[in-house]
């Protein structure tokens, strides 16, 4: 019998939000969802906790004062019960996953990580590079490393400048 997942995959009025870390949702289900829903109905998102982007290791205070382990795949698990407690995955890492793990092109990854989430949130002046849109832009190198961040047309981060 069909279940809720099957309904979600075929219902065109629904947009699916996925954390593409391989922990929250199995990679095969991510790929199945991408193929069934298409780029306009899948948004790559994160439920990152304080300390997002932290390297693997054990930390105190990242999540509700609990001791947690950031795993190599950027999942966050509580110690000692090993419960999944969020992610240390950034939105940039979602973009990198779209390209590297799921084989999507740069424009497709931008749709998954920017255009579709902005549409879902009703942010009609964001999510794409076009005239009249907010100039919120990240610049990446060929290896998809962050080189520059521009918010509302102002450079707020440059990888080649010392950070305060």
What is the role of each PLM region?
Residues 3-22, 29-46, 50-133, 137-140:
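His/Asp/Glu-enriched, well-ordered alpha-helical/loop segment
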Residues 23-24, 49-50, 144-145, 156:
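Short, glycine-/Ser/Thr-/acidic-enriched flexible segments
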Residues 119, 128-164:
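C-terminal cap of metal-dependent C-N hydrolases
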